[in-house]
Amino acid sequence: MIKEINIKIKNFEGPLDLLLHLVSQYEMDIFEVPLVPVIEQYLIYIQTMKELELELAGEYMLMASQLMLIKSRRLLPTVTETFIEDTEQLEYDLLAQIDEYRKYKMLSEDLDELHQERSHYYSKSKTEIITDETVLLQDKTALDLFLAFSKILELQRQQIEDDNTMIAAEKFTIADKIFELNQKFTEQKICKFTDLFSDKTNKDELVTTFMALLELIKNQQVSFSQGELFGEIILERKEISE
């Protein structure tokens, strides 16, 4: 059962951290970023977290309601000039929050780097510091692992709903999917993340396959990497040391 695996997403420090991660793909001034696509990605991510039955802080849902308000006002036909001004003000306030958080995070990272340098000077070895940085990079990539699956689930969600029939749904277990993934990685040591789901048309199978992959990653049987921001995620079977 999916509930048997306890997974905590600790990479995002809050909804603004998630939004900052989403707007960073545009590589432009925050106040010029198109908000509707960002809002859609945020809502897809939240929906995916629900699908995976993962714990979600209330602040994420509060932000989601605010984003849905902005999106709905954007999609409504123009009513009055005041309506437009109010909508633009809501968008500006949100982007200002994200920008303020970005500045705060940059300052926090600078202070953390300074702290690491001081710790290195007094006690830590160079090897220990490199190890810490490696873990940080891996954690950062984990954000995109969930975002990538969110996109896959959203793309297939409508098709899955349309394909519902009276035929009893096939049951999928994490144990079965772990076995299936192990077979795949035995035949093919390296594969693209998206390839794992290309032949899946059932929502339960998609979710169970993803949970099985997380279990393999947690047990250090599979590693994942990403060459560039929002690029293709590559999975690789880790060699078992004798």
UniProtKB/Swiss-Prot annotation:
It is found in: Cytoplasm. One of its GO terms (cellular component) is cytoplasm. Participates in chromosomal partition during cell division. May act via the formation of a condensin-like complex containing Smc and ScpB that pull DNA away from mid-cell into both cell halves. One of its GO terms (biological process) is DNA replication. The keyword Cell cycle applies. The keyword Cell division applies. Belongs to the ScpA family. It holds the Pfam family SMC_ScpA. Component of a cohesin-like complex composed of ScpA, ScpB and the Smc homodimer, in which ScpA and ScpB bind to the head domain of Smc. The presence of the three proteins is required for the association of the complex with DNA. Keywords: Cell cycle, Cell division, Chromosome partition, Cytoplasm. This is Segregation and condensation protein A.
